[in-house]
């Protein structure tokens, strides 16, 4: 059976998350349903990142095995046809070897978190960005965020329901920048804990609005205590933007 790697974009708002769940719509279920209509038999789709309810993706990666040997353009276009009207799109499809696994072969995952600091309600970006009603100091947030680089016990920024065996992770890159009224955080790591990015963002916003200093933020990280985390940022502003794999880009 040929194996295909697909790159996927989706609006996370209508979904309970990536992972298939009983009695709740998921991105995985939408893709598997569409792939089954193409292949004529049940198809399992494996994703690189199990995004939470409401979290978006610009370039989620998944793989699937089909009984039919189809061109990559046919796979992309046919799955997109059967996905309608769900807000999910296959941007690209490629043939890969049988040992490729979207989740376990990944070497790095990249996330973006979008914030807008304004008093007025959102209209065009509603559900796609976090509106913070106080002015954010993006430079202070960036400075504080550098404490997260490298290997740490991220218990403070780990959801209480996280099932990972260890809270220790290595963060490869993190940056906070302002673009007009929008503040964007980007970060990269091999893997993340459950709600780690949203927890880090929520605590950095405490720095951005002047409630915490960079030292307060570092102390919260070092405490390795979930109760020291600031408010968890909403899912609205979070996007999985890319997944890296070994070999040529």
UniProtKB/Swiss-Prot annotation:
SUPFAM superfamilies: Pseudouridine synthase. One of its GO terms (molecular function) is tRNA pseudouridine(38-40) synthase activity. Keywords: Isomerase, tRNA processing. It catalyses: uridine(38/39/40) in tRNA = pseudouridine(38/39/40) in tRNA. It comes from the Bacteria. The active site is at 52 (nucleophile). Disulfide bonds: none annotated. Its EC number is 5.4.99.12. Substrate binds at residue 111. InterPro entries: PsdUridine_synth_cat_dom_sf (IPR020103), PsdUridine_synth_TruA (IPR001406), PsdUridine_synth_TruA_a/b_dom (IPR020097), PsdUridine_synth_TruA_C (IPR020095), TruA/RsuA/RluB/E/F_N (IPR020094). One of its GO terms (biological process) is tRNA pseudouridine synthesis. It is an enzyme of class 5 (isomerase). Formation of pseudouridine at positions 38, 39 and 40 in the anticodon stem and loop of transfer RNAs. Homodimer. Belongs to the tRNA pseudouridine synthase TruA family. This is tRNA pseudouridine synthase A.
